[in-house]
A protein has these predicted regions:
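Bacterial Sec-dependent N-terminal signal peptides
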Residues: 1-21
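N-terminal glycine/threonine-rich, aromatic-flanked beta-hairpin/loop signature
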Residues: 51-79
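Calycin-type beta-barrel ligand-binding domains and close structural analogs
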Residues: 25, 31, 37, 48, ...
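Generic secondary-structure boundary signal with a strong preference for alpha-helix termini
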Residues: 14, 44, 183-184
């Protein structure tokens, strides 16, 4: 009886570790340098974009936190998107990537190269993008897949009313499809034929 109880307790403990392992795997997949160069060479409908993702604020217990920069390769020093993601485990077993914008973001352009990115910034100075969180789950094959919820992510870019994001994240690539729609559901920005395919490159900056 005692042995059975110990086995049951060990089983419960091991099951509680699985979600955290998924979070760690997701962050490991996300962190790095990515490029859509291969896709852009094959299809002129896509730009050659570079994506940098690094862990930040590693001593905080409410993360992991990730800083991202996204730029057309010809304008690497002038990124068109800078965000902070907070990765959290949900009670239903899924993972949530909460999205924050940065006030005056260009002052931090290139911070991904530093040993301690966004050192002069704190979470309470970020602006949460309500409704823009991406909810992810881990597929049986090991990759992660997720999307924003319904029309909850507001956007006024190029006449949009809301935006959607769909992602697939694997250990060597990431597919992201960001689109904006007007109030009638017509797409007004973003790729039309499918998501951007970012291949992971060797990241010489990030220390695991």
């Amino acid at each position: 009886m005692k042995a059975a109880l110990i086995f049951l307790l060990l089983l419960i403990f091991s099951l509680t570790l699985y979600p955290q392992r998924d979070v760690e795997a997701l962050v490991d997949y996300m962190v790095g340098s990515f490029s859509s160069e291969e896709q852009a060479e094959k299809d002129s409908g896509y730009f050659n974009i570079e994506l940098e993702m690094v862990k930040i604020w590693k001593d905080r217990r409410d993360g992991p936190w990730i800083y991202i920069e996204q730029a057309v390769v010809e304008s690497k020093d002038n990124p068109y998107r800078q965000r902070v993601y907070q990765i959290k485990q949900r009670s239903d077993g899924k993972i949530e990537s909460i999205v924050y914008s940065i006030p005056e973001p260009l002052r931090f352009a290139g911070d991904y190269k530093k040993e301690f990115p966004l050192l002069r910034l704190t979470p309470d100075s970020l602006l949460i993008r309500e409704g823009c969180e991406v909810v992810l789950y881990r597929a049986d094959d090991g990759y992660f897949e997720g999307r924003t919820i319904d029309k909850n992510c507001s956007s006024d870019l190029r006449g949009a009313s809301y935006a959607t994001s769909e992602v697939m994240i694997d250990k060597d690539k990431m597919i992201t499809w960001d689109r904006g729609f007007d109030e009638n559901g017509n797409q007004v920005w973003g790729a039309t034929e499918g998501g951007y395919i970012f291949k992971k490159k060797l990241n010489r900056f990030q220390k695991r």
